[in-house]
Design a protein with these regions (language model features):
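Short hydrophobic beta-strand segments in globular cytosolic domains
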Residues: 62, 135-136
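A conserved beta-strand-loop-helix scaffold within acyl/acetyltransferase catalytic domains
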Residues: 34-39, 45-52, 56-85
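Conserved acetyl-CoA-binding loop-helix of GNAT-fold acetyltransferases
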Residues: 80-83, 89-104, 125-130
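Short amphipathic alpha-helix that is part of the acyltransferase structural core
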Residues: 2-33
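Conserved beta-strand-loop-alpha-helix junction that forms the acyl-donor binding cleft
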Residues: 88, 114-124, 141-143
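Conserved GNAT acetyl-CoA-binding A-motif
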Residues: 104-116
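Short acidic/polar active-site loop segments enriched in Thr and Asp
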Residues: 51, 110, 134
Length: 143
């Protein structure tokens, strides 16, 4: 993808991160943080174990991922990962996930994991599997 940059956000702006969460998650039933205040966002974003990266094509924001490095469990949890609709079908999801996984493996965890569900983008699971992830557990939950 021409002019693609993926950068760690050193200054984790709660308003910007909330915007990304809302805008990207609106079609995928991301609801758990909608009621968070900016202070709650700030507290979450300032955790030392959190990494928050933004993908840009040129100067346009195209997506993001965040993960938590659970050193005590030797695990990295990709907590959110998504791209704007305008970038669907262009291969950006694969690049962004590969970046997240490479970054996560730098922590030397025993595993990297992500929750996904049937409400996610139809290609999400295929993307995870294509990058070496496996289905660990399936469960039915009512939303």
């Amino acid at each position: 993808i021409a002019n693609l940059k993926i950068e760690e956000s050193e200054k984790k702006d709660p308003q910007f991160c909330k915007f990304l969460y809302q805008k990207i998650g609106e079609d995928f039933y991301w609801k758990d943080r909608l009621a968070w205040s900016l202070k709650e966002w700030e507290n979450y974003l300032n955790q030392s174990k959190l990494k928050f990266c933004v993908a840009k094509v040129g100067e346009d924001v195209a997506g993001f991922y965040e993960y938590l490095n659970h050193e005590d469990k030797k695990e990295v949890e990709i907590s959110y990962f998504g791209i704007f609709k305008e970038y669907f079908g262009k291969g950006l999801g694969g690049y962004l996930l590969t970046h997240a996984l490479r970054s996560g493996w730098n922590h030397k965890p025993n595993r990297i994991w992500v929750h996904t569900c049937t409400l996610d983008h139809p290609h999400a699971l295929r993307n995870y599997i294509a990058r070496g992830m496996n289905i660990f557990k399936k469960e039915k939950v009512r939303v």
